Amino acid sequence: MSDAMDVLLAGRIGLLVRIQSHPGARLALLDALNDYCENLDQEPGTEAFMIALDPSDEDVIWLYEWFTDQEALDAHRASDAFADLMHRMPELVAVPPGVLPINPLRVRLAKQPLEQSL
């Protein structure tokens, strides 16, 4: 049997978010998102928050998030850390973020990436 994390996610709520920074502001936007990520322990219903770079556009960042349920998503949006992030966003983003609601079904992660830390 594999040591991979393999979880069914039925009932979870997910978001795929596309954020386009002002030209040259991607590093500042990444700093803001990483600062936000450091506070996710204050949101117990936020189960995953992934930041990814768009390889074809140096001004675009993608977020993948999933939450235990609607109540957790509402708590996420009502958190102080989220309010701080939203306060920083206007000077960093070129257009309003695109948000695509999704329903996560399953995640499988190999053990090795989980053992590596920042």
Ranges and model annotations:
Residues 28-38:
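A contiguous binding-surface segment within folded domains or other stable secondary-structure elements
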Residues 20-29:
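Short, surface-exposed ligand-recognition loops at beta-strand->loop->(often short) alpha-helix junctions
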Residues 12-19:
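Active-site-flanking beta-strand signature of metal-NTP-handling nucleotidyl enzymes
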Residues 37-61:
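Short, glycine- and small/hydrophobic-rich beta-strand elements in well-ordered beta-sheets
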Residues 23, 56-58, 68-71:
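Short, charged/polar surface micro-motifs in flexible loops or helix N-caps
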Residues 1-11, 51-59, 87-118:
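Glycine-rich beta-strand-turn "strand-cap" elements at beta-sheet edges
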Residues 8, 39-47, 66-100:
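An amphipathic, aromatic/His-enriched active-site/gating alpha helix that lines ligand/cofactor pockets
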